[in-house]
Amino acid sequence: TGRSRFLQVPFRLKCKDWLAGTKKGYHKDVYSEHYVPVEEVHDTIEERISEYRNQGKKPYFIQGGGHGNAGTQSYVDAYREIAAQEEELGMRFSHVFHATGTGSTQAGLVCGRELERQEQGERSGNRIVGISIAWPCPRGRDVVKESILDYYRMRRQQNPGQKLPEFCEEDLVFEDGYRLGGYGKSS
């Protein structure tokens, strides 16, 4: 149906059924694909999750674009890889540029850099620059900031005694000047 409001959005729900009592952790992957108009995606996902639960399954839903702490943690780990590569190459990158949409990539890179700085005892380092593919400022920047703060809240709950970096406004560089009218629009 083209680029109308009736654009069909595919999504895939995956459930793993673990067979209790086995040493190997046998599992069976179960997939279900549905195509719905974009405005029905949220409700359809909720309905399918409810159906799986009613069948005795235990679905785990990862938000689109990896938004949330699982996605943020992935990019905390990615930043550690960047730092390891800098060490291996004997150089420091002055900037890390990336596309930012749901906020998890940028939140993870910023948190990863701050955790690395804290561990290394330094305040210098590269700038993480998110180039917005979706939201204008301040909305997009606020989404990234909330993802950073939410990630630190989660870490504090998991490890109450762990010292974590404080969020610093200047560490969040969000550029929205390249959106050209918004996501999916041609120039």
Residue ranges and their predicted role:
Residues 89-95:
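Short helix-loop-beta connector
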Residues 117-187:
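Active-site/ligand-binding loops adjacent to catalytic centers
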